[in-house]
Amino acid sequence: MKIQFKKIVWRTLIVMFPIVASAIDDGPRMYWNGPVDTNILQTYYWTVHGNNVTPEGTQPNNNFETDISLGILAYNRIFDLAGHAMILTGVMTAGNISGTISTPINSTARSSRGLGDLYLQGVVNLFGAPALSAEEFARYKQGAVLSLLVGVTAPTGDYENSRALNMGANRWNARIGLPFMQTLGDWIPGEITTLEILPSVWFYGNNDDYTSLGLN
């Protein structure tokens, strides 16, 4: 039973960590409009320590510990697409992940470090966020905004099928979403309040080299 428990946890982690490593932060104001030809370079540091065997944090286990440390670099550029604002984004991650399973008999540890998968994303405004010059944007008052989001994760990260944990997923993933924003009250710098909703769906490709621990 102890051996079977370890296999179940490691199989869960094999799926979990590449998803975490290729994550993009969909935080507040991420999809606000901006002037055309604007370039934005963002850096993040993300660290997690816990005892959950699922990325949702819904299955804590006192026999398990995980540590994730990631550096995230994102580049954004705003374009004019037929009069609509379009934001192209590229995201790269690098860092290390580790997990330890403890039983009354022994402990088993696994770790991995390196580059994560490359994430590319395009967001095209459907209404409410026209393509604007810097001068026009200075007079812009945002109201209701709806956009179409399409993203792709490419299998560029470090991956070996002999490792229980990997920074890369060794498969293509795709995402589609509809970012929506509604300004509440006046558009006054420093006092802006918005309601932001982002429904999205992920589609996962196959990992043809997914043979670690006897998995297919």
Give short role names for the model-derived ranges.
Residues 1-32:
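Cleavable N-terminal export/targeting peptides
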Residues 21-42, 50, 130-144:
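Outer-membrane beta-barrel biogenesis signature
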Residues 22, 38, 66-74, 115-119, ...:
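Transmembrane beta-barrel architecture of outer-membrane proteins
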Residues 27-31, 58-62, 72-78:
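Short secondary-structure capping/turn segments at boundaries of alpha-helices and beta-strands
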Residues 39-41, 88-92, 146-152:
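Short coil-to-beta-strand
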Residues 48-70, 107-108, 161-166:
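Surface-exposed strand-loop-strand hairpins of Gram-negative outer-membrane beta-barrel proteins
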Residues 64-100, 188-215:
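Glycine- and aromatic-enriched membrane insertion/assembly motifs of diderm outer-membrane
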Residues 96-210:
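Outer-membrane pore/translocation modules
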